[in-house]
Amino acid sequence: MIKLRLTKDAKVGCCFLIFGLLNNLLYVIILSAALDLVGANVSKGVVLLSNIVPSLACKLSASILHVHKFKFAKRIGFCVFMSILGMQWIAWSSSVPSKMLGVSLAAISSSFGEISFLHLSSRYHSVSLPCWSSGTGLAGLFGASSYLVMTTWFNFSVRSTLIISSFLPLFLLIMYFFVLPESESTSPSINNNYTPIESIDLRAGHVSFNFVNSLKQTFIFMQPYLLSHMFPQFLVYFSEYTINIGVAPTLLFPPEKAGFSSFRDFYPTYQTVYQIGVFLSRSSISFFTVPYLRTLAITQFIILLFTILQSALYLTSSYHFVLFLIFVEGLIGGTVYVNVYHSLQTTESSQRELAISTVGSSDSSGIFLASLVSLFLEPSLCHFQADRGRDWCALT
């Protein structure tokens, strides 16, 4: 009996590790490819904005539309289809607007998949969430480093890299249908105090009433989580994505100081180091939990302010110190993410999946605001540098 239990836990852990890896992998590759997708003259915030708008829409609507009541097989199949379609669209597009449409398609898959797999994790043994989190961290590490290796070391074209990557989500279907054991719980978690949309009447008055009622109930349900869960996650994601998209492309040094051949190599290197931090911290939940989420969120914001000053004023000529800050940024981001969702596992089972959907919108909201800020922050920093004799941004 013990042997069977361990075997099942191992299968569940392996599946959720792969789920986290493959669901987030294309998202990371797209962000790592941001500079190559839009060029040096367009803010990388355009890529993030194209990614996060559909993602935010998915997460905001998840609790309102009761996504947790749909069958997982259909949800996962939809995610795989949208991933392949989005990456192929990006790869074969020539104009920036067309590429951004592909980014949006892939973003729908990633965000819908995250909510779905977090829902699925709540139906399994406690090993599922740590393995999911480790997988998402591994996706960051593997996605950023593989893009760096394929395009910088092996000189693969951006198109070839994207085409090869686009078919990886097919393994999600294999793991779900052929490897993942049956869950202990088979029925969707529904908050007994939450009023669902019981039916959709085609008469306009009934549709409006039901939607508004569901929206109100969602806001009521959200209130206990605002300060404890949603605020730390919002601030952390706003800070780290503003750094990654709005500031990091401008954190440049003479290439020879870092052992690089060109200024272009800095950005994917920052992304890789950041993802190492994310992977380590998201994997830490198996060993310890961190309760000081608001303190970490404020620390992340302080790092954002320092990197902005570094970009503008060149406070230090130490490339390795800045690289260390990027690593710490990844550690904080991953720590807050995994501890927020881990704490939701103690929520009453009838409310757990709805709580996950509700809290899940906070990270996307932070990323959305970061993308708007980055649209003007990155070019502003580049112009500020150029006015003071550092025109390195133009050389990326």
From Swiss-Prot:
InterPro entries documented for this protein: Battenin_disease_Cln3, Battenin_disease_Cln3_subgr, MFS_trans_sf
Disulphide bridges: none
Assigned keywords, A-Z: Amino-acid transport, Endoplasmic reticulum, Membrane, Transmembrane, Transmembrane helix, Transport, Vacuole
One GO BP: L-arginine transmembrane transport
Protein topology in the membrane: Multi-pass membrane protein
Keyword 4Fe-4S among record annotations: no
GO terms under cellular component: cell division site; cell tip; cytoplasm; endoplasmic reticulum; endoplasmic reticulum membrane; fungal-type vacuole membrane; vacuole
Domain of life: Eukaryota
Membrane-spanning ranges: 15-35, 45-65, 76-96, 138-158, 161-181, 234-254, 296-316, 321-341
Pfam families: CLN3
GO molecular function, one term: transmembrane transporter activity
Coiled coil, from the record: none
Main location per the UniProt record: endoplasmic reticulum
Keyword Disulfide bond attached: no
Cellular localization per UniProt: Endoplasmic reticulum membrane; Vacuole membrane
Effect of substituting G137A: Retarded location in the endoplasmic reticulum; enlarged vacuoles
Family, as annotated: Belongs to the battenin family.
Chain's role: Involved in vacuolar transport and vacuole pH homeostasis. Also required for cytokinesis.
PANTHER family per record: BATTENIN
Name recorded for this polypeptide: Protein btn1
Organism: Schizosaccharomyces pombe (strain 972 / ATCC 24843) (Fission yeast)
